[in-house]
């Protein structure tokens, strides 16, 4: 599981305090510690002691499918993160990357144990007018200019998913599909500006499901059972009602993914009751997602069959590398990188090491930059190995994401604009060379910015005939 974070910036004075004598010491004794230098301290390239070279990469497409979307793992309880939003929707017309289908599981609880409806006294009558499941809308990604509506269905979850275990993007809910609880159709082209009226008050855009009457009857029965019912305590309630499963209808042919803050899910019960003084009154009770007891997780399924990307992804990597690379926000496709030239590279001080990747846009005359929300605004880089163990390159924790870069940038050459992603990984390359690490791999993919599955980029691969292939540029000083 990978989650992107901005790390603390290193104190700049500790870098600029590096003196020439320290550099010379490392040159004479070998280099196994951090030797990243600011630009004004990088030695002049004299081709006697200090050189610069550009090295070819070997790049392949791989699947990155291990995003933690619910529960807890290694102390990180993602279900309790207030800024981790869940994807909901379908993309069915992406000819390059294929189809995406996103759904989620969410649980709610009464505000208190031994919940009771607001009645003046025992024996007064009560009528539930409606129960609404409300989930705030945050944003959307995809082709929001497409005027195609999407329908979402609500079902009852029939399996317990513990908040103390881990759920991933590939975790699928178990639901009672024979009994539809609610259905709602939305158009993401206008949804972001829709402000529903609740009474006389305008609300922020939200997904609102009016739940079936059979759910109202069932809930009311459990409450009226008192100590013997599900509303007596939180454990009983979650045993009785394990959660809601919200998913796109099978008939959807959308082109947009919506993002919802189901951390703020509300179940609102609107009802009337008779007062002891006569007449009726109206009121409401609210059940909510409670991070101390409830769980939530996001299921995101990618289907590449029939897409262009499917031609570049397989169980066996192309030994010559792929000519095109596909990078999605996790879960999805990522690019694996090997650098053959580093094998048996002479021991040196690496003064600068920078990877460069160039985007292809549009791809195959298909306007991916317009139709699907633009290229990844930022890619992230990880160090992995032959076993698939992923770690962020240490430059993130030492210097911060701004130093590593990976941001989308544009430059012009001969009147043509190009989009590139660059990564500064000097210390990582230094250790690979110093330790003669023959198992290392690097991996680039979209950053996880709280919007799982968003954004995509098509990049030139190492086997491309174009001269804008990915490359490693190094400035290094040989150790005599």
Regions from the PLM with identified roles:
Residues 2-480:
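Secreted, disulfide-rich extracellular signaling modules
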């Amino acid at each position: 599981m990978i989650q992107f974070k901005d790390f603390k910036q290193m104190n700049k004075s500790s870098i600029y305090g590096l003196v020439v004598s320290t550099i010379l010491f490392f040159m004479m004794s070998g280099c196994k510690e951090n030797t990243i230098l600011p630009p004004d301290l990088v030695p002049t390239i004299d081709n006697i002691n200090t050189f610069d070279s550009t090295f070819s990469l070997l790049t392949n497409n791989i699947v990155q499918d291990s995003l933690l979307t619910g529960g807890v793992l290694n102390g990180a309880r993602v279900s309790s993160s207030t800024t981790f939003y869940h994807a909901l929707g379908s993309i069915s017309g992406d000819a390059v990357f294929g189809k995406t289908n996103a759904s989620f599981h969410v649980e709610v609880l009464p505000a208190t144990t031994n919940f009771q409806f607001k009645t003046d006294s025992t024996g007064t009558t009560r009528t539930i007018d409606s129960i609404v499941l409300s989930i705030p809308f945050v944003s959307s990604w995809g082709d929001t200019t497409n005027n195609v509506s999407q329908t979402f269905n609500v079902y009852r979850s029939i399996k317990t998913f513990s908040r103390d275990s881990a759920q991933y993007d590939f975790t699928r809910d178990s639901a009672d599909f024979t009994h539809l609880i609610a259905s709602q159709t939305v158009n993401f082209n206008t949804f972001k500006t829709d402000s529903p009226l609740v009474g006389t008050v305008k609300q922020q855009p939200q997904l609102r499901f009016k739940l079936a009457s059979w759910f109202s009857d069932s809930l009311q029965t459990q409450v009226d059972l008192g100590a013997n019912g599900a509303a007596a305590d939180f454990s009983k309630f979650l045993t009785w009602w394990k959660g809601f499963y919200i998913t796109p209808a099978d008939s959807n042919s959308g082109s947009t993914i919506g993002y919802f803050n189901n951390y703020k899910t509300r179940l609102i019960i609107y009802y009337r009751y008779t007062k002891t003084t006569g007449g009726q009154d109206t009121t409401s009770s609210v059940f909510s997602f409670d991070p101390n007891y409830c769980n939530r997780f996001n299921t995101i399924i990618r289907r590449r069959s029939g897409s262009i990307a499917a031609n570049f992804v397989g169980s066996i990597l192309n030994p010559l590398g792929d000519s095109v690379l596909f990078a999605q926000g996790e879960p999805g496709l990522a690019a694996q990188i090997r650098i053959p030239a580093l094998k048996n590279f002479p021991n040196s001080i690496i003064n600068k090491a920078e990877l460069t990747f160039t985007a292809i846009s549009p791809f195959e005359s298909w306007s991916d930059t317009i139709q699907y929300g633009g290229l990844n605004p930022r890619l992230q880089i990880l160090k992995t190995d032959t076993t698939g163990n992923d770690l962020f390159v240490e430059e993130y924790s030492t210097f911060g994401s701004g130093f590593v870069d990976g941001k989308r940038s544009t430059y012009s050459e001969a009147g043509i604009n190009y989009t590139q992603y660059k990564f500064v990984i000097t210390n990582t390359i230094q250790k690979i060379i110093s330790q003669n690490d023959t198992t290392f791999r690097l991996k680039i993919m979209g950053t996880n910015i709280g919007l799982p599955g968003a954004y995509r980029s098509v990049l030139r691969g190492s086997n491309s005939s174009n001269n804008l292939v990915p490359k490693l540029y190094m400035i290094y000083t040989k150790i005599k």
